[in-house]
Amino acid sequence: MKALILDAENKTASVQELPLPSPGPNELLIAVKAVALNPVDALYTFNPLGSTGRIVGSDFAGLVVARGPPLPSSGYQNETPSGISSLRRSSTALSASINRGDRVAGFLQGACSVNIRPGAFAEYVVCPSDLVWRIPGTMTFEEAAGVSLCALTAAQGLFFRLGLDAPFQWDVDSEEAVLRRVESEISRDPGDDDELSFFVFGASTSVGMYVAQLVRHSAEMGGKRVKLIGTANPRNWDKLKAKPYAYDHLFDYRDATWPEKVREASEGGVHFAYDAISEALTVRDVSTILREGGKMAVVRSGEAGAWHAEGVRTKPIYGAVWEGLGEDVEYHNMLVSSSPAKRSFATAFYKWLSDGGLLQPNPVRLMPGGLEKIVEDGFALLGTNVTNRDQSRTEDHMKPISGEKLVYKIDTEKGVGSGDGHIA
């Protein structure tokens, strides 16, 4: 099969031939039909953490072509008859029901940390069966490819870290979840019972668009009114004011007075904020629009130097989306330890999507070519801290990104067998 392989020494990646992978216990072999690009993919190709030979890339969508053997019958450790085990059995039942020929989407951690796990930018991938979700018939492979990583990033920040009501059940009795609820109750503002105000910096980013939708789902489930405020380029305002985002107030992020305008629109400050950019001075500025007891989530780590801590008034809550994979993650000399609760949260979220959780995918910019064009075009367009966004290209597909997801179609050439799930 063809795959996009990291060349760490030269800070790039190239398409190479690799053997077809084999699914292990509780894993699926998936023929990739589309991949979506995230800034982290470009960042850690041009500024490598992984070693040469790793498959890069995160988001994928495709067809299941084979299943690995079932897990041993012992199941989960420390299983109890509580609601936790019921939820786990539900997620396990979903993963067991996914069969050859099903359309699924998911994400992997490709060359974004110090490990040997392969990524998604390949003709075939192997993924745990409980970390994919069924693509509804109304959604294309190209649309679905851009959902998994960014939507989970949004959900983790909102429900696991900020403590908003989730529109799906997860391990609410885990130690981490209980601590989050206690923190939320301690910091709760009396006005929260009537209306909560929520601010998104970067409302037209991929993560930001899922944040808005999930905030609306949360408010509906909890029976609350929500005042949704955001910053974005004015050319995206009409889209963001319409459903499913339905922003009440939008401001231009380039207007230096936007924090003052947000405080005015929220009558003194917001209850919650989500910084979907989290770089340089954005975290400081977002922290100034929180009311007393307000909380904010960020998508990048201050310890890794993504943003400046000076002047930040409220300690932001950070976590890596990779926590959902249930594996130890090491990058920037930090270790993000595996967490059963965070893995359970991810599987519950993807089960919700499979069961019909209604999220509108980001608008897609379908890029020409396939794997061979990702570095040359897609990564150049995304840019990184090492490679600035290319403004010199004049092709239509290379225009600046705004409110879109970059997606490539992948054509798998190898055939697969049938019946027993083994590769032909």
What is the meaning of each model-derived region?
Residues M1-G24, A31-L63, S73-Q77, P81-A93, ...:
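Terminal helix/beta-alpha structural elements that buttress the NAD(P)+-binding lobe
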